[in-house]
Curated annotation (Swiss-Prot):
It comes from Haemophilus influenzae (strain ATCC 51907 / DSM 11121 / KW20 / Rd). This is Acyl carrier protein. The gene is acpP. Gene3D superfamilies: ACP-like (1.10.1200.10). Signal peptide: none annotated. PROSITE patterns: CARRIER, PHOSPHOPANTETHEINE. One of its GO terms (biological process) is lipid A biosynthetic process.
Length: 76
């Protein structure tokens, strides 16, 4: 499974959204209905899945599906 597929799978599981709604440009809050707690849990799930640490100031910049994929790809 690619990084992109793994990130999308986590987003579907964490936010309870349909896979077809998880488009690269989709915003977690505006498009996928996440609240601040959801985004914190999403970042924690990404950290666990990819065994990385995402500092708070970086986590704040991860607001879309593509930004999450890019962050993981650049920090693995």
């Amino acid at each position: 499974m690619s990084i992109e597929e793994r990130v999308k799978k986590i987003i579907v599981e964490q936010l309870g959204v349909k896979e077809e709604d998880v488009k690269p440009e989709a915003s977690f809050v505006e498009d996928l209905g996440a609240d601040s707690l959801d985004t914190v849990e999403l970042v924690m799930a990404l950290e666990e899945e990819f065994d990385i640490e995402i500092p708070d100031e970086e986590a704040e910049k991860i607001t879309t599906v593509q930004s999450a994929i890019d962050y993981v790809q650049n920090n693995q």
